[in-house]
Design a protein with these regions (language model features):
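Metallo-beta-lactamase
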Residues: 33-34, 96, 126-212
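Short catalytic-loop micro-motif centered on adjacent basic/acidic residues
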Residues: 28-30, 55-57, 130-132
Length: 212
């Protein structure tokens, strides 16, 4: 059984997800913490629940989703894992921050491992399947667990909306096609955990999302 703990971090109210199972092994997805109190909230939870952090995963490499990568590397020695397309086609996090008018320096921790569609990532005795959902960014991916019926989708799909496509390498036609192909094809009751805002379900987005 996978437990999902969500945190709302940084100026963009980004959802950071910490997943762990009965083995107490954990993966961190889209670490967006950028303030001392946010870093403490995250590390306190990991410590109090006796978790061992095994992976730092990224659905995509926009700055609001990677603010905390430097902190995680310094604290736990983990480097991010992400899709190669984002590594090659997006500006560095610090460059992105400046373009958004942010004064805070964002450390660019090199991606240690490229993640590809169809790959299986181990989480204790559980698994996460990688789904490719480009369009919001060239290398956007999602993490799906069939047994527990959920997908962590980054900024590809939201409750009642979809990701913006006016940033580096974004493409609305590609995004909508990827959502239909990879996300709406999942079982109707699959819970969707987006990068911002509340969770939703596949069936709700099939019938209620005006962008699809």
């Amino acid at each position: 059984m996978i437990t999902i703990k969500s945190f709302e971090f940084n100026y963009f109210q980004e959802n950071t997800f910490l997943l762990y199972d009965d083995t107490r092994e954990a993966v961190l997805i889209d670490c967006g913490c950028c303030r001392k109190e946010e870093e403490k909230e995250l590390t306190d939870f990991i410590l109090e629940n006796k978790l061992t952090l095994k992976h730092l995963l990224c659905t995509h490499l926009h700055v609001d989703h990677v603010f905390g990568n430097g902190f995680i590397y310094k604290t736990y020695g983990l480097k991010p894992e992400a899709n190669k397309q984002d590594v090659e086609k997006l500006p560095s996090p610090d460059e992105q921050a400046k373009l958004f008018g942010l004064r805070q320096h964002v450390e660019n921790v090199p991606v240690e491992k490229y993640i590809v569609g169809g790959e299986i990532i181990k989480l204790g005795t559980s698994e996460l399947q990688v789904l490719t959902v480009p369009g919001h960014s060239p290398g956007s991916i999602a993490f799906y667990n069939k047994k527990n019926g959920f997908a962590i989708v980054g900024d590809a799909l939201f409750a009642g909306s979809i990701g913006r496509t006016d940033l580096w390498g974004g493409n609305q036609e590609v995004l909508v096609a990827a959502i239909h192909d990879k996300l709406l094809s999942l079982p109707d009751e699959t819970v969707i955990y987006p990068g911002h805002g509340p969770e939703t379900r596949v069936i709700d987005e099939k019938f209620n999302n005006p962008y699809l």
